Design a protein with these regions (language model features):
Chain B
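Terminal targeting signals and extreme-terminal segments of soluble enzymes
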Residues: 1-295
Length: 286, 295
């Protein structure tokens, strides 16, 4: 289960750190029925230099974090007064070299009693609104309990200011340095979502980093001389991450024509090492 | 032989000759012969057929784990690793999680020999063919009346037998290309393609999306669809496709420098008010991209 980002003002909820790190602006689009159950929310992220990956654009884990935040928020708004947790995220990034900013749009496709399905599209405003990525996410509907979910409508959250002290994504997400098939993340409180569990975007960033390291470690010398980057990613959030540390264990399934397929299993080591997320990542030499 | 009376005598799954086996309470395997009728441009099995295979193996596991409840596929993702090295291709599925409302299954697809044994090529096991994952929505028994409620006695081994395919699988559906560059293709919702709900089977939906993506992505690159190899399918099943015809459309994403490109394919049930039934992210590359000298 991944993040919900309730969108509270930053000064009221320091747990908005993850979406603020990418300076994600969000605004609600008018619903078809004009009611208070919106089906579409837009977002924009500037792609700051320290967040770019070897592909030249926003690294895929960062893009997935933004999609998880935007799609989760959109899905949550659509089921108020209930809320959601992400259960699966399927994304394809067809262009890795973005100019930026990237503009995203989330549209609720199906809203059922137990689940919400949302589609997401990404265009590169700096490249003439070129379509660079698409994703579909599924969320489970849940009772928010005592959590207060109040938003001024129509919702708008301005783009946060740039940090005077930028840190790279792996450092921000507390991903420990290393190489090989196992990559570890320290679970610090600022990476938790309003439910107190690890933000789904952090899980995606860990999967990206771990799969890229595993692909490089398993490759012959000379593979990806300019680096590697994730493109197609599928993640099933099976259980919430509560304790940490979090470990991504990768299995390289095969490599063909510059593309490596990696199965990623993420474990919450402090919760009896249980499997929390399983997915696959396609890693490209760039 | 059928699984609880499914599929009918004349059915795509029978013509694909799939054979299934429950290997434990939470695992199963399903295989089909890799024939020219289901081959893609690189000589491997089409991604849409692989998706059909894993949908069947996932459904077999889900039916056993959930009994007496039933299920419907909510999403399916398939990533092709490489072409099939053997005469048969086999999906080996295992349960990842069983929740109150959903069930998640993963499947590894491998090549096997005539006896179902793992292949050995140059002294080692070849790379798998594909990895897949699926989410099933749990349908409590009282809601499952249209789905063919399973009996407590589920078979542990069965085979779908038919006359076999004597023409390419897309022609057997049949797929009609209405507007290739727009990814507008169509299939009828006929019993030959039905699932246990009387709607178009999830694997057939994958085949249509694969074909639509290849048409649109090929046209965007000035290529024929038959020159494109689909490597990834990410499918969200939103509603049953029951009336037909089922018509696709595609939006092409940016194309990478190596010709790798993506498209978002939508399927609508034209006979049901043009209802959106499925959204699929499709990734494809030109077949020439698979130069064996490239690592």
């Amino acid at each position: 289960m991944s993040a919900v980002d309730a969108g509270e003002p930053a000064e009221a909820d320091p747990r908005r750190h993850v979406s603020d790190y990418f300076r994600l602006e969000r605004w609600e689009l008018a619903g078809e029925d004009g009611g208070d159950r919106p089906t579409s929310v837009a977002g924009r992220t500037p792609v700051d230099p320290h967040q770019r990956g070897p592909g030249g654009g926003l690294r895929t884990g960062g893009l997935l974090t933004n999609l998880d935040s935007l799609g989760g928020f959109t899905s949550g708004l659509s089921v108020l007064p209930q809320w959601i947790v992400t259960t699966s995220l399927m994304a394809t990034v067809s262009e890795l070299a973005h100019i930026g900013p990237l503009r995203m749009r989330a549209d609720v496709l199906r809203r059922g009693r137990n689940s919400v399905v949302t589609s997401l599209g990404v265009v590169d405003e700096g490249a003439g609104d070129r379509h660079v990525a698409a994703a579909t996410m599924s969320c489970a509907v849940l009772d928010p309990g005592a959590m207060v979910l109040h938003f001024d409508r129509p919702f708008h959250q301005a783009m946060p200011e740039a940090s005077p002290d930028p840190v790279r994504p792996d450092e921000f997400f507390c991903i420990e340095p290393g190489e090989g098939p196992v990559t570890r993340l320290r679970l610090e409180d600022r990476l938790r979502n309003p439910w107190g569990i690890l933000h789904g975007g952090a899980v995606a960033m860990l999967a990206d980093e771990a799969a890229c390291r595993a692909a490089v470690a398993a490759a012959p010398a000379g593979f990806g001389p300019n680096g590697v980057a994730a493109s197609d990613v599928v993640l099933h959030y099976l259980r919430p991450v509560k304790a940490g540390p979090v470990e991504a264990r990768c299995e390289v399934l095969g490599r063909r024509a510059g593309r490596t397929t990696v199965r990623v299993a993420i474990h919450d080591v402090g919760s009896d090492d249980r499997v929390v997320t399983v997915g696959s990542v396609a890693v490209l030499a760039v | 032989m059928t699984f609880l009376g499914y599929p009918p005598a004349e059915h795509l799954l029978g013509d694909l000759g799939m054979a299934a086996e429950i290997t434990s309470e939470t695992t199963a395997r399903v295989r089909t012969r890799a024939t020219p009728q289901i081959a893609s441009a690189d000589g491997g099995v089409r991604a849409g057929v692989l998706a059909t295979l894993v949908d069947v193996v996932g459904g077999a596991i889900a039916a056993r784990v959930l009994r007496p409840d039933w299920m419907a596929t909510a999403d399916l993702a398939l990533e092709v690793v490489g072409p099939v090295p053997g005469p048969w291709v086999e999906a080996r599925g295992s349960l990842l999680r069983r929740g109150r409302t959903t069930l998640v299954v993963e499947a590894l697809v491998v090549g096997v020999d005539e006896d179902g044994n793992d292949l050995v090529v140059d002294g080692r096991a070849p790379d798998p063919v594909a990895w897949a994952s699926m989410t099933f929505a749990v349908l409590p028994t009282q809601d499952a009346s249209s789905g063919g409620r399973p009996s407590p006695e589920l078979p542990t081994r069965w085979a779908f037998s038919g006359g076999g395919l004597d023409l390419p699988v897309l022609e057997a559906l049949p797929v009609t290309v209405l507007d290739g560059p727009a990814g507008r293709l169509s299939i009828p919702a006929r019993p030959y393609l039905h699932n246990s709900f009387g709607a178009v089977q999830g694997g057939v939906v994958a085949l249509l999306a694969e074909a639509a993506g290849a048409e649109a992505l090929g046209a965007a690159q000035g290529r024929d669809a038959s020159d494109m190899v689909v490597t990834d399918l990410q499918i969200a099943y939103l509603a049953l496709a029951k009336v037909g015809p089922i018509v696709s459309s595609a939006r092409v994403l940016a194309t990478g420098t190596d010709g790798r490109a993506g498209a978002v394919v939508e399927l609508h049930d034209a006979g049901a008010g043009h209802r959106l039934t499925t959204v699929v992210n499709v990734t494809a590359v030109p077949a020439e991209h698979f130069d064996p000298t490239v690592v």
